[in-house]
Swiss-Prot record:
GO terms for biological process, alphabetical: carbohydrate metabolic process; D-glycero-D-manno-heptose 7-phosphate biosynthetic process
Subcellular location: Cytoplasm
Family: Belongs to the SIS family. GmhA subfamily.
Protein name: Probable phosphoheptose isomerase
A single MF term (Gene Ontology): D-sedoheptulose 7-phosphate isomerase activity
Residue ranges constituting the SIS domain according to the UniProt record: 43-196
Gene giving rise to this polypeptide: gmhA
General function of this protein: Catalyzes the isomerization of sedoheptulose 7-phosphate in D-glycero-D-manno-heptose 7-phosphate.
First-level EC class: isomerase
Cofactor(s), names only, from the UniProt record: Zn(2+)
PROSITE patterns to which the protein is assigned, alphabetical: SIS (PS51464)
Amino acid sequence: MGRKDKYALIHYKLMDLSDYIEAGNKARRSIDLNHIEKIGRDIVNVFNSGGKLIVFGNGGSAADSQHFVAELSGHFSKERKALPAMALTVNTSALTAISNDYSYDVVFSRQLEAFAKPGDYVVGISTSGNSVNVVKGLERAKELGCKTLAMTGRSGGKIAKVAEEAIMIDSEVTSIIQEAHIAAIHMICSVIDSYY
């Protein structure tokens, strides 16, 4: 490959990156800040009533679940008490036992039966909105009397129809949806921190 071809390839890649950055910015701008503030207040009300936050998802969304919980049980933007939050994605023994003995489709709903109480706040994360185990988890959470939030992308999928609240990211690209989910999670944590 000649020098001119290398420069053309570098220019092409930089244009791809520029488009990617703009798509990410557009996705983050699709987040309704008033809705984020309401969700943060609702979670604070759950905490103040003795409830907890429970979060789950698959793959990158599982990582987002754990990140959300870490910001609350640990530290986000200021010193405050640890807040009661748990991710259903961290207990490998439970995940594999439930998947083996029952089905991966019920890996979250089964754990919710054990840990969720009426009034808890349950968040299911799925970039497609159609992960069967996330749908079933949110359905079970509602049956148990929990408040429910779907974090998704695209058109929202099934979880947006199941949950009481939904954050739907305006993108078709999984990685951009995931990045916007983390931005939304950080915004929610910022609202929560403002109450403590």
